[in-house]
């Protein structure tokens, strides 16, 4: 599996975001095993244990922009029970949160505030872009709306829909957990490579492309 390596670039200008240099590399743990099998296996076990704890205890930041936020909060109700995934502890401060959900329309005036909130979150941190407006601007192709929050934030998971159902948000959360389980992060600021290795995860659209094309018994609009 290919990984995307991101390193901090101290010489980057302040307006560049995310600040870092990216390149496609192989799994660093496999390279470590080839060099020293004992240390490589030990690092693999430690990394797996740390990632397991991170992905099963994700604290979301209580933040919303538009109607998609209503669908996100619905996922916290009893019928959906987001507590099954360990993500029910909503934080009122970005300094205590693990991930942020950009749910709704992001206006240009709001972009600096969102970026400031993201910068206040401590590492490791992740971003879920929820809804068509957050993903690409949606139907608001106008001067006042940012055409996708990935213009100024590093997005980990995109949840399509206008607005997405709570089930779609839960699937996005599970995809984020899967991605976190395969991440390679430094165990300490003084131990190991300080770069962040993220697995190159294929999109669900591409994974199900052949399955959807093979469908021939299409239902009428009255039956959907």
Curated annotation (Swiss-Prot):
Residues the record lists as binding [4Fe-4S] cluster: 67-68, 133, 162
Span list, region Disordered: 200-224
Cofactor notes: Binds 1 [4Fe-4S] cluster.
Cofactor(s), names only, from the UniProt record: [4Fe-4S] cluster
Keyword 4Fe-4S: yes
Annotated catalysed reactions: a quinone + NADH + 5 H(+)(in) = a quinol + NAD(+) + 4 H(+)(out)
GO biological process, one term: electron transport coupled proton transport
This protein's record includes keyword Amino-acid biosynthesis: no
E.C. number(s) listed in UniProt: 7.1.1.-
Enzyme class label: translocase
Membrane topology reported for the UniProt record: Peripheral membrane protein
Family stated for the protein in its record: Belongs to the complex I 20 kDa subunit family.
Subunit comment: NDH-1 is composed of 13 different subunits. Subunits NuoB, CD, E, F, and G constitute the peripheral sector of the complex.
Protein name, per record: NADH-quinone oxidoreductase subunit B
Organism: Pseudomonas fluorescens (strain Pf0-1)
Designated gene of the protein: nuoB
């Amino acid at each position: 599996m290919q990984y995307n390596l991101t390193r901090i670039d101290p010489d980057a200008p302040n307006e560049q975001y995310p600040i870092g240099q990216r390149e496609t590399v192989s799994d660093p743990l496999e390279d470590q095993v080839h060099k020293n099998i004992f240390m490589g296996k030990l690092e693999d076990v430690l990394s797996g244990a740390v990632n397991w704890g991170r992905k099963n205890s994700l604290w979301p930041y209580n933040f919303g922009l538009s109607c998609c936020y209503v669908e996100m909060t619905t996922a916290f109700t009893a019928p959906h029970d987001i507590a099954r995934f360990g993500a029910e502890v909503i934080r009122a401060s970005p300094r205590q949160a693990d991930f942020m959900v950009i749910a709704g329309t992001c206006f240009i005036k709001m972009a600096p505030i969102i970026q400031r909130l993201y910068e206040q979150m401590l590492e490791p941190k992740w971003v879920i872009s929820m809804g068509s407006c957050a993903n690409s601007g949606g139907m608001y192709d106008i001067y006042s709306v940012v055409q996708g929050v990935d213009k100024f934030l590093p997005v980990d998971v995109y949840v399509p829909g206008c607005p997405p159902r709570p089930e779609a948000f839960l699937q996005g959360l599970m995809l984020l957990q899967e991605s976190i389980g395969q991440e390679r992060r430094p165990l300490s600021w003084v131990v190991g490579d300080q770069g962040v290795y993220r697995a190159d995860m294929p999109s669900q659209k591409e994974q199900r492309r052949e399955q959807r094309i093979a469908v021939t018994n299409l239902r009428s609009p009255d039956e959907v």
